[in-house]
Amino acid sequence: MRKIVMILAAAAQFAWASAQVAPADRRMTKMGLTAAQLAHYMAPGVNLGNTMEACDWNDIFTNNAGLKSETSWQNDKTTESYIQSLKKQGFNSLRIPTSWVAGHIVDKEKMTIDPAWMLRIKEIVDYGLNAGLCVIINEHWDGGWMEHDAFTNLANVSEHKEMYRKLWVNIAKQFKDYDQRLLFAALNEPGVGGASPQAKGEMLAPDSKEFADRLLEYEQVFLDAVRSTGGKNAKRVLIMQGPKTEIDLAEKDTYDIARLKDSAKNRLMAEVHFYDPYIFTLMDKDADWGKVALYWKGHAPADDQGRTVNTISYNNKNVDAYQHITNLVMKMKKKFVDKGYPVVIGEYGANRKDAFLYGGNQKLHDESMMAWYSSVTAEMLKACLIPYVWDINVQPLPHMTLFNRAKEVVSDSYIFKGVMDGAEIGMETYHKIYPKP
């Protein structure tokens, strides 16, 4: 009986997801939509994680990685049928984290990208657009040459600007004829990740005005580079990352996206990421200051061994776990959405674990995972943020994986159902703010 109920529930879920997919229309394949209008079509989104961004920092400014890097962090080459399956499962957009500099540069002076690599990126972008998805490509961590090295106290800022400009001119030229369903994101997590072998100096404090000012300078370079290539890039929607893509840092007055000067009107979005709270989402070993959390509020055993997130300490106060999520996402609504800048949650997720390794209850841990994903997805959408769940195609636990790409099926029903349940809860409010244009 329980199996039948689960099957029926899954069928109902799929029916909801399919109903939310708006058919493509002529306006979508042009360039007339503002960022806010385009946002209507984008949620929910999913990442092609650990794939086209896979790299080795020792390969910076070389062409040593080649096409084989696509499967260096996970096993499967991306297929068009897999991307089509994402649309069928209820997703409306795809984020493709991308490396360009660490292993795919044939001429450092001109920042020329390996033609074979560019062709492969374009092929996957085409998979997404042909499937009816909006698509984001970015300059990801890429060995740290920008996200770390460009933000140190001894960085040659003018040199980084020029190299970054050349890189984005070369990328943008290749996509200048692509319609508005393709979006560019400047970076990934500026200020996060290790230094490249060429780094000099120490990282600026990410919460400082100096860091925010430098980030905005680089984002202006990105914006100007893309616009300079003309064609459809003149009006393409571009996505800007807050410091470290952390909500609290992006909220600070020091990071002011309105300072960016754009020749196109209302074509900018902001981006942050969400892996909160750390003890539940990313922590994998107990520490003297706390334990790995296995359970989310309302889903714990009687003896949880101190592994439940009921409240979260924030600014010296204990905040209800669910309220904490709401508080964080509403910061982004107030800072950006209410001022006309849609917000992309470029990544969010929590590692589902083998609870037995911690002496825990697997069933209640799995329920907790589903509850977290549902709550986070719903609250993001109700705050009119565009969520992109992180997915890496790693099957053994721990993982942040929804799908088995080789088989093109859902491989983690707990995470997937959590995301789709949350989307069902949040999309009505989301579409009130972002109605169909």
List where the protein language model places each region.
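Bacterial Sec-dependent N-terminal signal peptides
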Residues: 1-20
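Active-site region of glycoside hydrolase catalytic domains
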Residues: 158-321, 330-351, 382-385
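Acidic/histidine-rich helix-loop elements
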Residues: 49-78, 107-113, 156, 279-322, ...
